[in-house]
């Protein structure tokens, strides 16, 4: 799958398109096809300093909106095809700047039909602060 990753700390110029393995959902997790990912000040800080995520390489992004592709064992609230948005576990569950992301089902909610993916991806972390 395609992802926006970085191999060094720095400004936006360190972000690059790369190919990485597609993750698989584990117990209690869902695989989401990303339609939009939020960009927050903490993403910029981590891109520059690695403050919460450590040293590169890594894929940033905590806020995500998309479509459920697969569910892990024990997930009953979501099915493939459901539109969802949510917050990946903060601070270590980053990775929304990719075509697909895996996260705990409990970190997502169903996206209302009248809310676009771009708008939905802007809500999670900002809604907590």
Regions found by a protein language model. Name each.
Residues 6-14:
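Extracellular beta-rich ligand/substrate-recognition surface
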């Amino acid at each position: 799958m395609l992802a926006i990753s970085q191999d060094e700390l720095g400004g936006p110029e360190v972000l690059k398109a790369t190919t990485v393995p597609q993750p698989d959902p584990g117990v209690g997790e869902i695989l989401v096809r990303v339609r939009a990912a939020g960009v927050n000040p903490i993403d910029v800080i981590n891109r520059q300093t690695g403050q919460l995520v450590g040293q590169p390489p890594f894929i940033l992004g905590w806020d995500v909106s998309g479509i459920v592709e697969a569910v892990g064992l024990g997930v009953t609230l979501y099915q493939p095809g459901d539109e969802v948005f949510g917050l990946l576990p903060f601070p270590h569950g980053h990775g929304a700047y990719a075509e697909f992301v895996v996260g705990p089902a409990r970190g997502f909610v169903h996206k209302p039909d009248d809310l676009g993916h771009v708008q939905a991806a802007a809500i999670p972390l900002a809604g907590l602060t």
